[in-house]
Amino acid sequence: MVFLSRNPRAMTAFFEIINGNMKPDAGTFNWGVTITTAYLPLDNTDFFNTDLNLVDWLSQFGEGNEVYMKGFLGRMLFSGEEVLKKVSVLSGGEKMRCMIARMQLRNANCLILDTPTNHLDLESIQAFNNNLKTYRGNILFSSHDHEFIQTVANRIIELTPNGIIDKMMEYDEYITSDHIKELRAKMYGDK
């Protein structure tokens, strides 16, 4: 399911709260006992303050030998000598690909993705989409990428200043529906 809002900071705060990194202003939130989560945060800067190579960096976040780690990196288009590159010199897109490999390593049944296609090139987005198509768990995400939303989401939840809009439908239908347009205008207080 995709979460939408005109306020991107609200989306990030929401994901930080449900991931346990931030306390809500009011109320509580708890996952069910069978839920295991993997979070892909919007800001990944703190994860890359090291001189480790990609394989050693990824090994910090899960168990497995070098070949196992290279397999996860390979799914995100790192191959050959690239896996020995220092993480401190990675581009924004390469860092995001590493974070996706890290998230996949957790083998969670619920993925939380805060604008996951930021910094990714088309080839990386396609590889990520293909991985998500075969994923058997729940995916909660926000994105500005129309194609990504259309491909991954089957439920739309929009957070507005006056409540939520929650619809089981494809994104293209959501953005073209006259009923939804009227509802959004009302919920945002548009004239």
Where is each model-derived feature located?
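ABC ATP-binding cassette signature C-motif
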Residues: 1-191
